[in-house]
């Protein structure tokens, strides 16, 4: 950043820090604070010597904040864009997001009311390792989905980040849905003679699915961190 300021309210104190070109200016300032406020306020400006274009569109922030609200249930995130005016009020554009039940509410929002099934959600915790020579790590997993003949969507998140290219969560979803639906059709003798078994493409066409996981160790597919390889 070209410059950054940080104001932190915690444990009865107000802390303030100034930075310029990555270096602290003036040291840490600390003063007693008698209010009830807690949290952090960060102001910063991208450095145009580092970034070729610092005019980041509002749509980028909106999409990022919305996704963060989805995977952090009950958290309200607000966005005010002083460059864009609200045509109804003439004031700065303001938007907020909050999904009280996280990904389950998000799936319901995307799918709408006319769905083939209700939204199903589940959550689980586990401890495991990816290889025998690696240490154990904890993982918290949650998923929500429904079926619709009008909307199709698959999204995966890990440690609050959107996995644009999926990785192991996507592979797991493909395997699980195909296996379970195929088993059901076979057990109920619903396949016609000579009919091909179901593929994930058949499932995907009507599936609205979102998963969110958190782990204490993460293995990324590459440096873009848009896919994970955790087993």
PLM-predicted stretches and their roles:
Residues 59, 66-68, 74-225:
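GHKL/Histidine-kinase-like ATPase module
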Residues 1-109:
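GHKL-type ATPase core
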């Amino acid at each position: 950043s070209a410059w950054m300021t940080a104001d932190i309210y915690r444990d009865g104190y107000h802390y303030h820090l100034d930075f310029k070109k990555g270096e602290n200016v003036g040291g840490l300032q600390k003063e007693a604070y008698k209010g009830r406020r807690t949290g952090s306020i960060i102001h910063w400006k991208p450095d145009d010597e580092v970034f070729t274009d610092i005019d980041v569109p509002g749509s980028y922030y909106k999409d990022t904040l919305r996704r963060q609200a989805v995977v952090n249930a009950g958290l309200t995130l607000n966005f005010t864009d002083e460059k864009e005016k609200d045509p109804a009020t003439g004031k700065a554009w303001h938007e907020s997001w909050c999904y009280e039940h996280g990904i389950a509410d998000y799936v319901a929002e995307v799918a709408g009311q006319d769905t083939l099934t209700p939204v199903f959600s589940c959550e689980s915790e586990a401890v495991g390792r990816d290889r025998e020579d690696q240490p154990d790590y904890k993982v918290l997993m949650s998923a929500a989905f429904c079926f619709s003949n009008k909307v199709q969507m698959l999204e995966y998140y890990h440690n609050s980040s959107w996995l644009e290219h999926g990785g192991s969560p996507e592979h797991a979803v493909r395997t699980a849905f195909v296996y379970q639906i195929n088993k059901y059709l076979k057990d109920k003798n619903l396949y016609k003679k000579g009919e091909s078994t179901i593929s994930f493409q058949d499932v995907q066409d009507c599936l609205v699915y979102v998963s969110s996981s958190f782990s204490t160790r993460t293995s990324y597919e590459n440096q873009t961190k848009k896919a994970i390889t955790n087993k």
